[in-house]
Amino acid sequence: MIRNIAFDLGGVVLALSYEQAVRRFEEIGLRDSRRHLDAFEQKGIFGALESGQITAEDFRSELSIMVGRELTMEECYTAWHGYVDHVPRRNLEAILDLRARGYKVCLLSNTNPFMMQWANRDFDGEGHPIGYFFDAMYLSYECKVMKPRREIFDIMLRGQQSLPEETVFVDDGPRNVEAAAAMGMRTLCPQNNEDWRAMLDEVLACKERESID
């Protein structure tokens, strides 16, 4: 029986805009930003930030060297926020409904302090922080490890007190989904901003039928 549902953030809960992020970083001076940015797993100082190896201030300092001028924290925040297109209300309502139905619902995300600064303020445009929608959040920069490493999935499963076979993992990153499936989780891999509600309902209904049989 499924008891635990883990959601990725970018591309699943919120709609991503990779091109907007590229433009924002170019605007602050990172001319080759497309080479540095990724939609699923960051590298270089971007990956170091999201894996908790460096702080937000370290990132600001390192990026300042890369662009050849002193950047402010606000400029870094604005650039990172370029990844956010919008937060579909349908997703938030579906997540709250899953919790009301008794599922444990958590966030499992490769993210960083700049993104969470925004998400912890007013995630839905109605004054609710992102934590309002989840039972727990497992963030790469706090866990000190990024998906698709097994360790971050283990941290999530321990925190949720759930087995892999009791868990559905929803992520738009194919490598992340493959890693979760290899551990025994049921997985969904929607495209960025795809409506995943019917797909998830089908997985949950299928598992419920299996448990009855």
Enumerate the predicted regions with their spans.
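Phosphate-binding loop of NTP-binding sites
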Residues: 107
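A structural alpha-helix within SAM-dependent methyltransferase catalytic domains
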Residues: 96-99, 157
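Surface-exposed beta-strand edges and their flanking turn/coil or helix-capping segments
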Residues: 28-29, 51, 71, 95, ...
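Asp-based, Mg2+/Mn2+-dependent phosphohydrolase catalytic module
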Residues: 1-3, 7, 112-113, 117-213
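N-terminal helical cap/lid subdomain that shapes the substrate entry/recognition surface
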Residues: 2-93, 100-101, 112-116
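A generic structural motif
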Residues: 102-104, 185
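Anion (oxyanion) recognition and catalysis
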Residues: 99-100, 181
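Structured helix-beta-strand junction loops
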Residues: 101-102, 133
